[in-house]
Amino acid sequence: MFSWEASLSNELYFVRQYFYSGNYTKLFEIDTTSMSEKGLELTEIYMARAKLALGESLESIQSILTQKTPGSAAILALAGEGNMELIIDQHGNSDSVVQTLGAIFQIKNGSFDDAMDLLKKSVENLEAVALQVYIHLREHKIEAAEQTLKQALDWADEEIVLQLAQSWIKIVSGGVESYNDAFYVFEELNGTDSNPMTLTGMACADICLLRPEEALSSLKTALDSQPNYEEALSNMTTAITDLGPDAPSQAKNILSSFTNSSTLKLNDHLNEKAQEFDTFSTQFLSTA
């Protein structure tokens, strides 16, 4: 939630709910005709972000944006049209949308320190909090992630984006109770409107709870809905590895058909980890 959304809390409730739960179909169905100017601006940015997440074309993303703002420029830059660094330089000190989307851009490019610096400029911005939690967890700083979330709860209600951040803290922290808590959050969000994001969250918790068969079922459904959804593919790789020879051939075939695509960042990540493993193996064998 961007900082000046506080005054638009009721107007944007379902917009945020649908976006952060990955229920993009419901998001696109929202009637924007009676929205305030600022409410419309934020809703269009959420919708454009949803289109970007679904892999839609730049033209499709542009078509949803009727207002020219620093935020709309930032989402277009995130989609590959524009200079994000310039937008950050011009608006990063004051615009919450630019701070959030600029940080996402920097995270995608591996500039985690720059992203954290930008996020810390944001005032009462729930998504900025969630992104800081993500960076802390990526750096294995669980206590820092917990403290960041705790501080946010001093001034914010337990909005959906904070519930999701809490769930990922629980998954990284470990323990059966924490895994179950995370699973139930994703299961509740999945509800009657199943979507790839919540299905993948459930699957991740299932993997941690040593339930790879259940995880594969959720992941197959996620990929049926959104092919090339890399988070689902990553977790499917883990679930298949956990099952070993018992992994169903159908799941192996699904994974193989996607990972043969050279465009997937997942392949780059897997190749990077394979090279690291080979390096460590060589070092170990040389000292054994």
Curated annotation (Swiss-Prot):
An example Gene Ontology molecular-function term: structural molecule activity
Phosphoserine found at: S262
GO cellular component, one term: Golgi membrane
Main location: cytoplasm
Any one Gene Ontology BP term: endoplasmic reticulum to Golgi vesicle-mediated transport
Annotated keywords: Cytoplasm, Cytoplasmic vesicle, ER-Golgi transport, Golgi apparatus, Membrane, Phosphoprotein, Protein transport, Transport
Gene3D superfamilies, sorted: Tetratricopeptide repeat domain
Bilayer disposition of the protein: Peripheral membrane protein
SS bond list: none
Localization, UniProt: Cytoplasm; Golgi apparatus membrane; Cytoplasmic vesicle, COPI-coated vesicle membrane
Alphabetical list of Pfam families matching this protein: Coatomer_E (PF04733)
InterPro entries: Coatomer_esu, TPR-like_helical_dom_sf
Family stated for the protein in its record: Belongs to the COPE family.
Function (record text): The coatomer is a cytosolic protein complex that binds to dilysine motifs and reversibly associates with Golgi non-clathrin-coated vesicles, which further mediate biosynthetic protein transport from the ER, via the Golgi up to the trans Golgi network. The coatomer complex is required for budding from Golgi membranes, and is essential for the retrograde Golgi-to-ER transport of dilysine-tagged proteins.
Assembly with partners or alone: Oligomeric complex that consists of at least the alpha, beta, beta', gamma, delta, epsilon and zeta subunits.
Protein name stated in the entry: Probable coatomer subunit epsilon
Organism in which the protein naturally occurs: Schizosaccharomyces pombe (strain 972 / ATCC 24843)
Designated gene of the protein: sec28
